[in-house]
Swiss-Prot record:
Short name of any one Pfam family annotated for the protein: Ribosomal_L13
One GO-annotated biological process of the protein: negative regulation of translation
GO cellular component: cytosolic large ribosomal subunit
Protein known as: Large ribosomal subunit protein uL13
Single GO MF descriptor: mRNA binding
Subunit organization: Part of the 50S ribosomal subunit.
Keywords for this protein: Ribonucleoprotein, Ribosomal protein
Function: This protein is one of the early assembly proteins of the 50S ribosomal subunit, although it is not seen to bind rRNA by itself. It is important during the early stages of 50S assembly.
Lineage: Bacteria, Bacillati, Bacillota, Bacilli, Bacillales
Domain of life from the UniProt record: Bacteria
Similarity section: Belongs to the universal ribosomal protein uL13 family.
Length: 145
């Protein structure tokens, strides 16, 4: 009888990828990066095991949003004090917090639980073109489309 292959966490081979966000659309970049982090691009993908690779995103400050989202899209957060609802537009987020903007988009596409928290630790986002992960010899990942 044949059995379905199940990957084991200690047998997974992980690669490092660099993705340049300059001129890329936020959602299209985020879906592909979330898929890499999860390991869905591998034939050994197992839903309950972290089979994904590490991803480094550079030039987060140069991400592109379509339509009028720079002014219309609003990011909400709460200070946990009464009346503490704060809001920022996507333009404010891109100029002041570009790393957080990308992290929020990608983490929203990952599982909500222990596996999602473990997978999100393999995401490294940098606003500029420099990153401190040269020792890992990351490969440049070309996005589809």
């Amino acid at each position: 009888m044949r059995t379905t292959f199940m990957a084991k966490a200690n047998e997974v081979e992980r690669k490092w990828y660099v993705v340049d966000a300059e001129g890329q659309t936020l959602g299209r970049l985020s879906t592909e990066v979330a898929s890499i982090l999860r390991g869905k691009h591998k034939p050994t993908f197992t839903p309950h095991v972290d089979t994904g690779d590490h991803v480094i995103i550079i030039n987060a400050e140069k991400i592109h949003l379509t339509g009028n989202k720079l002014n219309d899209k609003i990011y909400y957060r709460h200070t946990n004090h009464p009346g503490g609802l704060k809001q920022r537009t996507a333009l404010e987020m891109r100029t002041n917090y570009p790393v957080q903007m990308l992290e929020l988009a990608i983490k929203g596409m990952l599982p909500k639980g222990r596996l999602g928290r473990q997978v999100s630790k393999k995401l490294n986002v940098y606003a500029g073109a420099e990153h401190p992960h040269q020792a890992q010899q990351p490969e440049v990942y070309e996005l589809r489309g």
